[in-house]
Amino acid sequence: MKQTASSLAGPGLACLTLLTVLALGSGCSSVRDARLAEIRPGPRCDFTEGATFDNRPSYLSAGQENALIGALSRLFGVYNKDIHQVTIRQEASRLVARFHAADGTGIEAAGSASSKSYSAEGEQLVINRWSSCKPGEAGAGCVWSRVELSCTVENDLVVKQVDGGAVLLALIIPMGQRRTQFGVYRRVDPAE
């Protein structure tokens, strides 16, 4: 049987159609608070002598009020509404937190982890890092999250939460997502 131009176009057209569907079906998205670019970074936060910050942020990315970064004490697993200030001190390879009421009295953090291990990466201290990769019925994917602490030139604390994920749907179509949200906590003098 002699092949014609139309019969040769069949496999080529099918391949082109498949590639077009894959290109349109794959994708990435990135959500980043634009105000992050306005933050003027300072030197690495020095917590060796201890530093006290407001527990509530002076700025918080939209929709993050109930998130981990919605209050500084939540980073250490404490959800007490009476906490007004958090003092963070660097001890060995851990950041240790002390919690204070408005009148300066200490608030005990029963049943919580009032310290976190950290790693230094450039001018940032990284805590709460985790990742997970798993296969599933529809494909395979990975998710990750980390919380970065840094200081501004005004010596305020910036807590940035970076989350992301990637998936290979049907082991063919790649998709990815990354989200960056943050809160700024003012450095204050400890309440007496």
Locations of regions flagged by a protein language model:
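Sec-dependent bacterial lipoprotein signal peptides
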Residues: M1-C28
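Predominantly extracellular/secreted and cell-surface proteins with exposed
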Residues: K81-P135
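Intrinsically disordered, low-complexity, compositionally biased regions/tails
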Residues: A14-L16, S115, T180
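Short, intrinsically disordered, charge-biased short linear motifs at domain edges
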Residues: L13-L18, I39-R40, S119-G122
